[in-house]
């Protein structure tokens, strides 16, 4: 297993993308600190990791609150001795365009996506340096952070900012042997998230593809070169690779698990 003996702290552990990543890290041998503002999501994520034979704790935390983040990072150290892997995935969906979004909504959404990553990255990095750990950090982006998407101004802007944050932090922390990368998912098949929510015993409606934003096709997967949408387990495997020694010379890099979405020439319709 790639991550045997490693401790991973994962934020935003809903049953979909981040739940899949948390379970993927556990399957490669990591023990988990599962964090979400929804205590049921955090706890059921931890229980799913324990069911796989690993250790896990859950922490309910607002990632924008420095006091709560400080306490969460301290508890990870108390419980496991420290953190080896940080995955910043906490998010907030609010699908509005520039003409509809209020400044309060803008601040809250960008605060969750950017400030949350800033706080966890800063505090976990300080802990890693204090403990002499050559750790790994992964920020979860989105194809919306690479491309313009109508009706999603706060999310896309924050994800784009997080992409550059990754590169900048990678340079700041390289001298300490801490690698920092990002992982870009795209529109994701809902089946696995729904199955995981049922298995966890929690409610997760998730964004319905084709209904979330104006102009989406009925079958978004048909527009990808791979002709299908990825699932959270695909992201989990990619995150495990980035966090492993197999990626020891990779930092400041964005790994796109998007079925070729970003690389595709815009006018080509693979499904036609």
Name what the model sees in each region:
Residues 126, 130, 171-175, 248:
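Alpha-helical segment proximal to the catalytic Tyr-Lys
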Residues 3-32:
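Canonical Rossmann dinucleotide-binding motif of NAD(H)/NADP(H)-dependent dehydrogenases/reductases
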Residues 30-45:
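Conserved glycine-rich Rossmann-like NAD(P)H-binding loop of the short-chain dehydrogenase/reductase
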Residues 142:
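Residue(s) in the substrate-gating loop at a strand-loop-helix junction
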Residues 147, 240, 251-272:
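Short C-terminal tail/terminal secondary-structure segment
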Residues 97-98, 105-110, 220:
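Substrate-binding pocket helix/loop in short-chain dehydrogenase/reductase
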Residues 121, 158, 166:
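Active-site helix of classical SDR
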């Amino acid at each position: 297993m790639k991550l045997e003996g490693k401790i991973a702290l994962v934020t935003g552990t809903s049953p979909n993308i981040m739940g899949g990543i948390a379970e993927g890290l556990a399957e490669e041998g990591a023990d988990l600190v599962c964090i979400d503002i929804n205590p049921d999501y955090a706890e059921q994520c931890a229980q799913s990791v324990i069911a796989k034979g690993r250790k896990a704790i859950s922490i309910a935390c607002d990632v924008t609150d420095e006091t709560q983040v400080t306490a969460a990072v301290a508890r990870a150290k108390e419980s496991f001795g420290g953190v080896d892997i940080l995955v910043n995935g906490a998010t907030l969906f609010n699908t509005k365009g520039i003409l509809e979004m209020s400044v309060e909504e803008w601040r809250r959404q960008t605060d969750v996506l950017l400030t949350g990553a800033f706080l966890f990255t800063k505090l976990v990095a300080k802990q890693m340096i204090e403990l002499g750990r050559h750790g790994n950090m992964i920020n979860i982006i989105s194809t919306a952070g690479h491309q313009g998407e109508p009706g999603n101004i706060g999310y896309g802007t924050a994800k784009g900012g997080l992409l550059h944050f990754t590169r900048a932090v990678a340079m700041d922390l390289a001298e300490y042997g801490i690698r920092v990368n990002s992982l870009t998912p795209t529109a994701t098949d809902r089946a696995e998230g729904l199955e995981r929510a049922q298995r966890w015993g929690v409610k997760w409606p998730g964004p319905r593809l084709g209904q979330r934003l104006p102009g989406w096709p009925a079958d978004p997967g048909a527009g990808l070169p791979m002709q299908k949408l990825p699932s959270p387990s695909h992201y989990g495997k990619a995150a495990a690779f980035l966090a492993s020694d197999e990626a020891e010379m990779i930092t400041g890099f964005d790994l796109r698990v998007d079925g070729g979405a970003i690389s595709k020439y815009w006018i080509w319709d693979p499904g036609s």
